[in-house]
């Protein structure tokens, strides 16, 4: 009552509990009659509360969650846990992320199937963030192409156009931008057949 926590969507409460001689941080998050966005936000809020707390493994009590909602919580947490800190040389120790894993405990068995799809999306989001966050001396046309080559293993069809090929296709605007750089231009084309090869 003192905390006024009633489980409303977006409401949270953090407290410390002693368990087996150890102090455990417990985060309560409200989703009310929440929709997909509420459960994903709840997952993100969990990480926001503990990301730099020193905790390495987070357990989410999922017994009262549907399989879909359990996967959504994990998805939101995964998205929120992404950070680009490798160039931050003066980051205080207490500001460094520590969370390495999150487990949704006692979730319905079907949650794993839902998570497979969400995990693929989360990995794609992380790759995109990495590519747009890296500085220009690290990610430039040629290195951008190189960073994406591993997508071939997933079935993505990749083709690359160089300066001459782009000029032959009349891509003068793109080449005009490239003239301001000492790096050669590249155009990466990616195709994904989501039908498993049945589409012609």
Show which residues each predicted segment covers.
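Short amphipathic alpha-helical segment within the helicase RecA-like ATPase core
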Residues: 1-200
């Amino acid at each position: 009552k003192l905390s006024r926590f009633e489980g409303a969507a977006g409401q949270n409460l953090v407290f410390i509990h002693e368990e087996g001689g150890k102090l455990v941080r417990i985060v309560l998050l409200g989703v009310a009659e929440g929709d997909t966005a509420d459960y994903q936000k709840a997952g993100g809020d969990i990480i926001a509360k503990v990301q730099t707390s020193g905790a390495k493994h987070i357990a989410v009590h999922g017994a009262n969650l549907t399989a879909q909602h359990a996967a959504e919580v994990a998805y939101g947490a995964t998205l929120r846990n992404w950070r680009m800190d490798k160039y931050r040389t003066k980051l205080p120790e207490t500001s460094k992320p520590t969370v390495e894993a999150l487990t949704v405990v006692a979730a319905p068995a079907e949650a794993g199937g839902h998570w497979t799809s969400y995990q693929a999306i989360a990995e794609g989001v992380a790759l995109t963030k990495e590519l747009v966050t890296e500085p220009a001396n690290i990610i430039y046309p040629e290195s951008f192409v190189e960073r994406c080559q591993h997508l071939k293993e997933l079935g993505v069809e990749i083709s690359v156009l160089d300066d001459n090929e782009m000029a032959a296709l009349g891509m003068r605007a793109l080449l005009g931008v490239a003239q301001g750089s000492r790096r050669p231009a590249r155009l990466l084309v990616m195709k994904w057949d989501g039908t498993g090869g049945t589409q012609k």
